Amino acid sequence: MGLVFRTATQAAALLLSLLGWVLSCLTNYLPHWKNLNLELNEMENWTMGLWKSCVIQEEVGRQCKDFDSFLALPAELQVSRVLMSLCNGLGLLGLLASGCGLDCLRLGETQEGLKKRLLTLGGTLLWTSGVMVLVPVSWVAHKTVREFWDETMPEIVPRWEFGEALFLGWFAGFCLVLGGCVLHCAACWSPAPAASSHYAVAGPRDHQQHLELKQANPEI
């Protein structure tokens, strides 16, 4: 029963981590980290991501343009690009390592130690990638809040607001951290040995030894 529960826990944690990894990839490439609504022209909305910015107009539709230079970006977007790209790579490695370390995958009796190490490595990589999602998303959100409430800027100047990708990134980071921690704990958890079979074999053996001792010493 313990082995079945551990296998189900590993599978659920791996699926949760897979969901978090897919969402982190979407967070990386979606141009919706920041939204800008122009009060003077409500028919025009701007969005910004890590790789490009877009303008949405009712007559023309969506038009996007990639950023010309990496060095011209703000510091938070530069660091976010690097961390999000590393997150996607580490998350993929973590999924592959964890998948090879699942109990439901048979690698032979002599490979149990290898499976445990793979599961531990995969869980560590996954929760590390989750942290690498939460850091840039939270940094960009903090910078957006500071700029939004900046009293030195004139009120007529439009301000950036939270985009949908930030909320998607927070959820992705939570899934990766939780899934990675569960996989790491499942690798360290060993099911209790079956005690019933031990006593089932030891019982008749003790009874036989008692009969032999009684025959050798009738006074017992």
From Swiss-Prot:
InterPro entries: Claudin, Claudin_CS, PMP22/EMP/MP20/Claudin. It is found in: Cell junction, Tight junction; Cell membrane. The keyword 4Fe-4S does not apply. It comes from the Eukaryota. The keyword Transmembrane helix applies. One of its GO terms (biological process) is calcium-independent cell-cell adhesion via plasma membrane cell-adhesion molecules. The chain crosses the membrane at residues 11-31, 82-102, 121-141, 165-185. It is a multi-pass membrane protein. Pfam families: PMP22_Claudin (PF00822). GO terms for molecular function: identical protein binding; structural molecule activity. Gene3D superfamilies: 1.20.140.150. Its main location: other. Residues 1-10, 103-120, 186-220 are cytoplasmic. Residues 32-81, 142-164 are extracellular. One of its GO terms (cellular component) is plasma membrane. Keywords: Cell junction, Cell membrane, Membrane, Tight junction, Transmembrane, Transmembrane helix. Belongs to the claudin family. Plays a major role in tight junction-specific obliteration of the intercellular space, through calcium-independent cell-adhesion activity. This is Claudin-22. It comes from Mus musculus (Mouse). The gene is Cldn22.
